[in-house]
Regions:
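C-terminal catalytic and target-recognition region of SAM-dependent MTase-like enzymes
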Residues: 309-323, 327-329, 350, 369-459
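Helix-to-beta-strand junctions that scaffold the AdoMet/dcAdoMet cofactor pocket
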Residues: 276, 367-369
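Mobile active-site "lid"/loop adjacent to the S-adenosyl-L-methionine
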Residues: 276, 325-361, 379-383
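S-adenosyl-L-methionine
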Residues: 284-316
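Conserved class I S-adenosyl-L-methionine
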Residues: 254-262
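Class I Rossmann-like S-adenosyl-L-methionine
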Residues: 1-231
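Short beta-strand element of Class I
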Residues: 278-282
């Protein structure tokens, strides 16, 4: 198996699901590959998913038949081939085309191979001049129907103006975002902020490593070196600064019992353990696989317990700090969660909001009098953030101690250190009158609700 053939197969499966793309594990498929080939497969698959809508639109402009009538395996090959031609400058065109054609002939027939050859060579002809990031057309790509923007701030000039005429649809296609998400953003934050968010979604999310002393740095080495670096000290972790900031809101508290209700793979659990070393911490997650990872990660940590969902009986009414990092639309972390770029719609948002409310209602009986709740999402949507917190305050007679809505930062071509995810977090209590501002080790310029860029924050 070659790295390309593995990606072809994986994208074929995804093409049946689109826009409901799955988060697939690499599993056994890439184990036989060496590090270089694994890195290539990873870059090709993630790059294709991140620009799926853009690539599909360009491919459709070269077709005489409906995209939906093409065999899923061939759709996967075409997407991967177009991604190499347009997104991976180091890959020669002939390498991208030849393996796509040969794999298709083996998988299907010579006719299908000829079809793939013709379409990918049309993509090569469609790709024109490459613009420097300082070129005005590259900087204002959304104004032009013939500009294909790239993650480094550069852009391709296409030989035909194939992007849609309508500006909002064009923005979604060029930035590879769903129409419903673009329209929702325009309706809530306006056109200018939507443009900035869309441009941010073209950038590559860096890997941020939190060192044992709490400092945060962008990792620039290989994945193998990163794995070794993390194994050397289990206090190191991968975490974006915005994600780390939410737990830092609890820094001035002295909780005896903490529950991390939706712990995922334990990123915030690790941070809670570091910030509150004397607390008893109970962590859970409804997903069996993630819960197994939690058991492995905290196997030798005495004051962290991994429990089954809803098995918190012995701490009912005794929890001092409840952490609710709830499932959400992921709209603040789309460069990291490319699968979420296309599935946003009003009905899904309503479903997520309902799920979040269910989680809140199920978990709040754990709290003792005067306890605190940390509510966090990686979403930009007010329905999942500010409106949920408003509902919590009314429904449970709670008060907001601090809240923060954070816009994502970092544009294509910017230094990786400027990048931050977007998100929201709020610390609430039913007994906030007992709290004073100086009880919290927070930034002095932080307001109760802000949209500031946490560029200089440390996790």
């Amino acid at each position: 198996m070659t790295p390309r053939s593995i990606v072809f197969q994986r994208l074929a499966r995804q093409s049946v699901r689109f826009p409901d793309l799955a988060i697939e594990s690499k599993g056994h498929e890439t184990k036989a590959l060496d590090e270089r080939d694994r890195a290539f497969a990873r870059a090709l698959e993630l790059g294709t998913i991140a620009r799926w809508r853009s690539l599909q639109h360009l491919l459709e402009s070269c077709l005489k038949r409906s995209w939906g009538n093409i065999d899923p395996a061939v759709r996967g090959v075409l997407l991967a081939g177009a991604a190499q031609i347009l997104l991976m400058e180091a890959v020669p065109d002939h390498a991208a085309v030849d393996e796509a054609v040969n794999w298709t002939k083996k998988r299907s027939n010579a006719g299908a191979g000829g079809f793939v050859n013709g379409v990918l060579r049309s993509i090569i002809r469609l790709r024109g001049e490459r613009l420097d990031r300082n070129d005005e057309r590259a900087r204002e790509w959304w104004l032009h129907r013939d500009i294909f923007p790239l993650e480094n701030g550069e852009a391709w000039v296409l030989t035909k103006a194939v992007f849609p005429e309508e500006p909002t649809v064009r923005l979604g296609v060029q930035a590879s975002l769903g129409d419903d998400l673009i329209l929702s953003w325009i309706g809530t934050v306006g056109w200018e902020t939507t443009l900035v968010r869309a441009a941010h979604c073209l950038s590559r999310a860096p890997i941020n490593v939190i060192e044992k002393d709490g400092t945060n740095a962008v990792w620039e080495g290989s994945h193998r070196a990163l794995a070794e670096h993390l194994r050397e000290d289990d206090r190191r972790r991968i975490q974006d600064r915005v994600s780390a900031m939410s737990v830092n809101l609890t820094g001035g508290l002295t909780p005896e019992v903490i529950v991390d209700f939706c712990a995922g793979r334990g990123t915030k659990t690790h941070q809670l353990h570091r910030l509150h070393p004397n607390s008893r911490i109970l962590a859970s997650d409804p997903h069996d696989g993630r819960r197994a990872e939690l058991h492995e990660a905290f196997d030798h940590v005495e004051n962290v317990e991994i429990v089954e969902p809803r098995r918190f009986g012995d701490v009912l009414g005794k929890v001092d700090l409840l952490v609710l990092d709830v499932p959400c639309s992921n709209s603040g972390v789309l460069p990291r969660r490319s699968q979420a770029r296309y599935r946003f719609n009003t009905e899904r948002l309503k479903s997520l909001v309902a799920l979040q409310k269910t989680i809140v209602e199920e978990s709040l009986p754990l709290l003792r009098e005067g306890a605190h709740v940390l509510y966090a999402t990686c979403s930009l949507e007010k329905a999942e953030n500010e409106k949920q917190v408003d509902w919590i305050t009314r429904r449970f007679d709670a008060e907001v101690v601090r809240s923060r809505a954070i816009e994502p930062a970092g544009l294509p071509g910017d230094e990786p250190s400027t990048y931050t995810d977007g998100g929201f977090h709020a610390l609430l209590t039913r007994d906030s009158a007992r709290l004073r501002d100086d009880d919290f080790s927070l930034h002095s310029n932080e307001s109760n609700s802000s949209h500031e860029n946490p560029e200089n924050s440390k996790a």
